[in-house]
A protein has these predicted regions:
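Extracytosolic ligand-binding ectodomains
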Residues: 1-318
Length: 318
């Protein structure tokens, strides 16, 4: 993934006429610190990348001391260093994380399921519980009450007992805070028990297919794959021209470098710090228009309602 990120950044930098310095953070703390020290020696003005929290965590103090901003390509949640900092650090995130995903989920399902008997369930993990709790809270704020909530046992080949409980409760729709394989098993059990069930989940559905296929019509609230965005065409064309694979991380790397190059150019034109440009500017990228708030979080919400068509997830009409 790191190599793909670097390929995208390299091609974008060439397109923008920007100088690029690449260092491997090895996805660990030592690698992150060494990469940051290398960037300081090279007088880098903006660092992009970071797919691993440990590497970002270790790089932060070094880059902060050098007054170097970071456009983080893949770490969506604040690191411990950031959470402890008295003021927002110079980290600007392209990945939006659980907050925006569950906000979008609550909004979409609140509209779609207003007249439906729905359930909210989770797999008992910290992340699964967090997803379910946030979605449930959002739905309750909209005066919607589930007919059933439960924690199910994950990793089973079939979920007949769970689906039987959903059927007894009268639930025809269910949000699942859990993994793709579990959601596939729930769908298969619903079909086996002849219980019509609309199933929704989050970005955990965007994983490699397991032994059981997902049920057609399964809903996913998550960002659209970068390579499927209409705005991604320039990156896809440039990557193909360079005989490189136009996959998600290559396109994210391309967008990260676009933002960095544009921010530096504008800062020089306006004779202002790069950090100010990142905090106040709006950037046209292959991921769409990107603007950051005071905490370095994207102001837009890239999560969309998608429906499984039997082969892949496609945008769903509300």
């Amino acid at each position: 993934m790191g190599n793909q990120l670097a390929e995208g950044a390299r091609i974008a930098a060439a397109t923008k006429g920007a100088e690029l310095v690449i260092s491997d953070d090895r996805c660990d703390a030592e690698g992150g610190r060494e990469a940051a020290e290398h960037f300081v020696r090279e007088n880098v003005r903006i660092v992009t990348g970071f797919l691993c929290p440990d590497a970002l965590e270790a790089a932060l103090p070094v880059l902060a001391a050098g007054n170097i901003a970071i456009v983080a390509s893949g770490v969506s949640e604040p690191t411990l260093t950031e959470r402890r900092a008295p003021a927002p650090m110079a980290v600007f995130r392209l990945a939006t994380g659980l907050d925006k995903e569950t906000q979008a989920t609550g909004s979409f399902l609140g509209s779609l399921w207003r007249a439906q008997a729905f359930a909210v369930i989770d797999d008992g993990t910290i992340e699964g519980r967090e997803r379910a709790a946030r979605v449930l809270a959002s739905l309750k704020e909209q005066q919607l009450q589930p007919v059933f909530t439960d924690t199910y046992r994950p990793g089973l080949d079939n979920q007949n007992a769970l689906v039987a409980r959903l059927r007894r409760a009268g639930a025809t729709h269910v949000y699942v805070g859990g993994e793709r394989d579990d959601i596939a098993a729930i769908g298969a059990s619903a079909a086996a028990l002849n219980h019509p069930l609309t199933i929704a989940g989050g970005s955990l559905l965007d994983a490699a297919p397991g032994a059981q296929p997902l049920s057609q019509g399964t809903l996913m609230i998550a960002p659209v794959r970068p390579q499927d965005l209409s705005t991604a065409k320039p990156a896809i064309d440039a990557l193909h021209q360079a005989a490189k694979l136009a996959d998600a991380y290559a396109i994210i790397g391309y967008a990260s470098a676009e933002i960095a190059a544009d921010a530096i150019l504008r800062a020089d034109e306006k004779k202002q710090p790069v950090l100010d440009t990142l905090r106040t500017g709006s950037f046209e990228t292959v991921l769409g228009t990107i603007k950051f708030d005071d905490n370095g979080i994207r102001t837009d919400n890239p999560n969309r309602l998608q429906r499984f068509d039997g082969k892949r997830f496609v945008l769903a009409d509300k």
